[in-house]
């Protein structure tokens, strides 16, 4: 575990998408980042077992998860919270969400690490005279036993090995559908496997994207 100021986030969130996330979090007044190493992400672990574990040069199976807070605090402050200090409530109220960093680089674009399951607090619901309406899903995270909860819509970047853009879009759509219609949550590779039961011209993994028939087959 490491606690760093938000100003130092560029070494962890880089590339075009990482910079966008950093700008978004700056708008939310992010001040502190807690870096959780060796995080086991369920979605990535399933994708790892289905594809990466059998690759010639298999990557690490653990990810890195970044937790963002609007409150400024030190590592000592966090340790006190872990011991049940009253500062726990302050941490919960300042929680802005998390970003999972996969141990896989996107060498086709900018060489940055792929962004895994990410859930960040939305912008304020009002902006001057305008009212914003967001499609959200309850997102929970546990940091060394401390529970955090925000309402957001999780997303991640496409992973061309197991989940091209259509797969990732389907993965995002499952979150609200799981509440409305009790649709089971699947990992990106599981979505790809289910969708490509419709015969195609290419092998299932690595994924080369879906045809319209594949999208229809999934739903």
Regions found by a protein language model. Give the residues of each.
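Active-site-proximal segments of catalytic enzyme domains
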Residues: 204-219
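Active-site nucleophile-adjacent alpha helix/oxyanion-hole segment immediately C-terminal to the catalytic cysteine
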Residues: 131-202
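An acidic intrinsically disordered interaction segment
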Residues: 114-142
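Long, charge-dense tracts
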Residues: 1-119, 124
């Amino acid at each position: 575990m490491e606690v760093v100021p938000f100003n130092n986030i560029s070494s962890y969130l880089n590339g075009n998408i990482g910079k966008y996330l950093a700008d978004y979090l700056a708008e939310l007044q992010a001040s502190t980042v807690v870096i959780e190493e060796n995080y086991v992400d369920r979605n990535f672990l399933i994708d790892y077992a289905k594809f990466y574990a059998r690759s010639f040069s298999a990557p690490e199976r653990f990810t890195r998860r970044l937790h963002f807070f609007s409150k400024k605090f030190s590592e000592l402050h966090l340790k006190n919270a872990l011991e049940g200090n009253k500062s726990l409530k302050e941490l919960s109220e300042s929680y802005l969400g998390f970003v999972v960093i996969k141990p896989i680089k996107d060498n086709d674009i900018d060489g940055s690490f792929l962004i895994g399951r990410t859930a960040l607090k939305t912008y304020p619901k009002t902006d001057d005279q305008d009212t914003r309406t967001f499609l959200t899903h309850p997102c929970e995270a546990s940091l060394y036993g401390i529970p955090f909860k925000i309402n957001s819509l999780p997303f991640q970047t496409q992973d061309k090995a197991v989940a091209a853009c259509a797969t990732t879009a389907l993965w995002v759509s499952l979150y609200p559908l799981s509440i409305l219609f009790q649709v089971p949550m699947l990992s990106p590779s599981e979505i790809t496997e289910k969708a490509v039961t419709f015969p195609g011209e290419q092998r299932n993994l690595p994924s080369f994207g879906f045809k319209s028939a594949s999208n229809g087959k999934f739903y």
